[in-house]
Curated annotation (Swiss-Prot):
Catalytic reactions on record: L-glutamine + H2O = L-glutamate + NH4(+)
Protein name: Glutaminase
Organism: Pseudomonas fluorescens (strain SBW25)
Alphabetically ordered keywords of this record: Hydrolase
EC number: 3.5.1.2
Gene field: glsA
């Protein structure tokens, strides 16, 4: 496995320079584009890494999975009264569908859906940002994970569209807390800094029927785990989820920080990171690396 990871990174490295680092969040635009890392964590505790797997990066929309899990843990099936679990087929920050469907987001991984989930968690936790930070520290086994306040502030200064979505949902009665307070939590969740190693470990419960592979803690039930994985498979890569299913064949979640996490149910979790994105907002080299890895080991669930 170790040799394979190194070989795959060598194969995809020529793609660096063909994508574009996210620049609509200024703090992300400054990230050096020539970085590439991958980490694999097994249900048996085995761990492999290559490249810049220990380098911290902004998780961005990958945090939406953590938020969803917190909401499911507290609210169970009741959360689906406020949002769906269907693919959107629209850009992650689109408002057209949200208006047409009267403020009920299609799924928890588009921005509107993630904001509803944050609204749910805002009602539950006294200090949502600290609750999220402590949750990911526990999942990853890394007590040093922090929020990058510069990235969070940068997002807040360029978050008008997210605010518009929140107020639109509030007008339909599907947003209960103060919009600014929820946005503050949301931007801080996205600004969590983690490495490929951290994320592969943190997602291990999704490959292990809801139980963390490194701590033994039950995070979700087996049924809830299948539900989260199914939403990742259909909606986890913005409007490129179908292409990811075709090429990689695994549940996954990406972020505009350049990270992608993929789950091999019953076996492994994988995180790859390269900051340059393709036109859909997903890591260009990361997508190819996961495609090659899945193909060579036969990991596709299809």
């Amino acid at each position: 496995m170790q040799a394979m990871l190194s070989s795959i990174l060598d194969e995809v490295r020529p793609l660096i320079g063909l994508g574009k680092v996210a620049d609509y969040i200024p703090a992300l635009a400054d990230v050096p584009a020539n970085q590439l890392g991958i980490a694999v964590y097994g249900n048996d505790g085995s761990a492999y890494r290559a490249g810049d797997a220990d380098t911290l990066f902004s998780v961005q929309s990958i945090s939406k999975v953590f938020s969803l899990v917190q909401a499911i843990d507290h609210g169970g099936e009741t959360i689906w009264e406020r949002l769906g679990h269907e693919p959107s087929g629209q850009p992650f920050n689109s408002m057209v569908q949200l208006e047409f469907e009267r403020g009920r987001p299609r799924n928890p991984f588009i921005n509107a859906g993630a904001l509803v989930i944050c609204d749910i968690n805002q009602s539950r936790f006294a200090v949502p940002i600290l609750s999220m930070r402590d949750f990911v520290r526990r999942l990853s086994g890394n007590p040093h994970i922090l929020v990058n306040s510069v990235v969070a502030e940068s997002e807040a200064q360029h978050g008008a569209r997210n605010a518009a979505m929140a107020y639109l949902m509030k007008s339909f009665g599907n947003f209960h807390n103060d919009v600014d307070a929820v946005l503050h939590s949301y931007f801080n969740y996205c600004a969590l800094q983690m490495s490929c190693v951290d994320l592969a470990k943190a997602f291990s419960f999704l490959a292990n029927e809801g139980t963390s592979a490194h701590s033994g803690e039950q995070i979700l039930t087996a049924r809830q785990t299948r539900q989260v994985n199914s939403i990742m498979a259909t909606s986890g890569l913005y409007d490129e989820a179908g292409n990811f299913a075709y090429r990689v064949g695994l549940p996954g979640k990406s972020g505009v920080g350049g990270g992608i996490v993929a789950v091999v149910p019953g076996q492994f979790t994988v995180c790859v990171w390269s900051p340059e994105l393709n036109a859909a907002g997903n890591s260009l080299a990361g997508m190819k690396a996961l495609e090659l890895l899945s193909e060579r080991i036969g990991w596709s669930v299809f």
